């Protein structure tokens, strides 16, 4: 359950460490969940990384601390809120994805991110 002003960890090697959600496009909702695309701004970044502090990117949410109910009745939740930064074409900005990601990301059509992840839960 992600809303505006929420800080997210970045689960790729794009150079950004923490981002803040500034918008939830494509949905007239207040909250975003697993597999949703949000607009973020970089708050912490590594100096040699591709993503620079203050820049605005699109990102897909891959982990949430709030549990999400699946169609089979099970629930999935993670220890943190995390995202993967996207370029203007919807492809991941980094070349690696760190940590597990939710199956909902693959189901929403982001197969490239799912293939880069070490584990799809």
From Swiss-Prot:
SUPFAM superfamilies: Ribosomal protein L14. GO terms for molecular function: large ribosomal subunit rRNA binding; structural constituent of ribosome. One of its GO terms (biological process) is translation. Keywords: Ribonucleoprotein, Ribosomal protein, RNA-binding, rRNA-binding. GO terms for cellular component: cytosolic large ribosomal subunit. PANTHER family: 50S/60S RIBOSOMAL PROTEIN L14/L23, LARGE RIBOSOMAL SUBUNIT PROTEIN UL14M. Binds to 23S rRNA. Forms part of two intersubunit bridges in the 70S ribosome. Part of the 50S ribosomal subunit. Forms a cluster with proteins L3 and L19. In the 70S ribosome, L14 and L19 interact and together make contacts with the 16S rRNA in bridges B5 and B8. Belongs to the universal ribosomal protein uL14 family. This is Large ribosomal subunit protein uL14. It comes from Aquifex aeolicus (strain VF5).
């Amino acid at each position: 359950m992600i809303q505006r002003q929420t800080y997210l960890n970045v689960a790729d090697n794009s150079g950004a460490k923490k981002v803040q959600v500034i918008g939830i496009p494509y949905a007239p909702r207040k909250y975003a969940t697993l597999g949703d695309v949000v607009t973020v701004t970089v708050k912490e970044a590594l100096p040699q990384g591709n993503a620079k502090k203050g820049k605005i990117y699109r990102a897909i949410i891959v982990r949430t601390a709030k549990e999400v109910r699946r169609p089979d009745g099970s629930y999935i939740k993670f220890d943190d809120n995390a995202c993967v930064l996207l370029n203007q074409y919807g492809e991941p900005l980094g070349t690696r994805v760190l940590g597990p990601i939710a199956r909902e990301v693959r189901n929403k059509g982001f197969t490239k991110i799912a293939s880069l992840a070490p584990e799809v839960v």
